[in-house]
Amino acid sequence: MLRNILVRSTGSNFKFAGRYMKSSALLGYYRRVNYYSTKIQTRLTSENYPDVHRDPRFKKLTSDDLNYFKSILSEQEILRASESEDLSFYNEDWMRKYKGQSKLVLRPKSVEKVSLILNYCNDEKIAVVPQGGNTGLVGGSVPIFDELILSLANLNKIRDFDPVSGILKCDAGVILENANNYVMEQNYMFPLDLGAKGSCHVGGVVATNAGGLRLLRYGSLHGSVLGLEVVMPNGQIVNSMHSMRKDNTGYDLKQLFIGSEGTIGIITGVSILTVPKPKAFNVSYLSVESFEDVQKVFVRARQELSEILSAFEFMDAKSQVLAKSQLKDAAFPLEDEHPFYILIETSGSNKDHDDSKLETFLENVMEEGIVTDGVVAQDETELQNLWKWREMIPEASQANGGVYKYDVSLPLKDLYSLVEATNARLSEAELVGDSPKPVVGAIGYGHVGDGNLHLNVAVREYNKNIEKTLEPFVYEFVSSKHGSVSAEHGLGFQKKNYIGYSKSPEEVKMMKDLKVHYDPNGILNPYKYI
């Protein structure tokens, strides 16, 4: 059994019995969270937020517009709303919190067609929402009103891969898992991994500057992306699909589009540096009694595991209770419940070397009483099962009906204090409790290595009373600790009005100036970002 993998021998000594899995098991690490709540009927965003008005500059689609699109696209590249098809898959976000009213989805199969579409929409002032896998969590990939949806799903080809340098060039619509599988066959690995890897697109993760579970080891996409192909709002194609790791000639323009959420250009191609595939992996699931101990274990892990440390995740007790409610057939990894849990992944090139380092680390933190209990996966199946207790949290948070998700950065010492403050505020407002109370509770989990907290407020319904209790309270708290209101999910529609809590007025003005310069008609992803 898993709980017997760390076996007390004598005194405070512990016997390490973990084995490393085959490298191919990485393919199954992170499954896409595919839960789609049906307990809450999605209302139109325009109804939920009546203070947001449709921009009168934007034209409503006419038969002439449709005829033009038919002249440049095949029948398979055009989806229209009808009595039998309301385009809900494209109009609604994953959480069923935001819903637009688009009547037309275009799925071009070439960059040139993307260019023609944008050139026409810019001239006609037709608003456009770029959409990848639609796995975003801040309402950034769905329309607010009747904007045209431009899906990149048909731009899904691998263009080139250099097995010497590890540089991959691909279309923006390539699914992240497919890109990773492709380079894994050649002993490389994508430098980013997400729970939504089975649905999200490479272009989408670049456009949102997604962080994910490997940032601790491989850094952000600002460092991994070498070049981009972008179609500007006027249809101009900017091709900078470089394969050079060093290029010191002028402004690094690609950085403007990484994290820009499709507001100044649509990414259609990505050149990215992949990393050598590790040969040895291991996952440990540990318990500690306080968040202070979480920090102590992290410091020790960085010191003692060093170059083989690839993920360090923490989960609070409530998050694991929710996960357990969904993993009904799975045995909890530990015998007893604890206030906090840690999931550590190591990956390296030498099994014996990594085995020795991990064994020493675990013995040290357990002898000193920092870690109270723990298990180590012995095979691929157990490894994936341990990861499920982290991966299931987003799905479990929504299982009661809905979830308010906040993705923030905070100094490590303050990381969990936001969860405590949020629970206290919800309790004071008398919103938390058993049904009919609308709030189940607030939970915390996240990436300790980069100070990224995921605060999930599980609810039985979405309502304005809950939202007003949480916002701007959460953002004010983050600002008071000099954090960021968005660590990796982006701004989208949800956080557009709160960027001032993380950026100065001068910075916001520069961003708005860039938007006006590159998209003077404001057609790309309106009502969002800034």
Swiss-Prot record:
Remaining remarks: Present with 11400 molecules/cell in log phase SD medium.
Subunit: Interacts with F-actin.
Organism: Saccharomyces cerevisiae (strain ATCC 204508 / S288c)
EC number(s) reported in the record: 1.1.99.40, 1.1.2.4
Annotated function: Catalyzes the reversible oxidation of (R)-2-hydroxyglutarate to 2-oxoglutarate coupled to reduction of pyruvate to (R)-lactate. Can also use oxaloacetate as electron acceptor instead of pyruvate producing (R)-malate. In addition to its enzymatic role it could play an important role in the yeast cell morphology.
Keywords assigned by UniProt, alphabetized: FAD, Flavoprotein, Mitochondrion, Oxidoreductase, Transit peptide
Presence of keyword Mitochondrion: yes
Coiled-coil features, chain-numbered ranges: none
Cellular component GO terms, alphabetical: mitochondrial matrix; mitochondrion
Compartments it resides in: Mitochondrion matrix
GO molecular function: (R)-2-hydroxyglutarate dehydrogenase activity; actin binding; D-lactate dehydrogenase (cytochrome) activity; FAD binding
Record-given protein name: D-2-hydroxyglutarate--pyruvate transhydrogenase DLD2
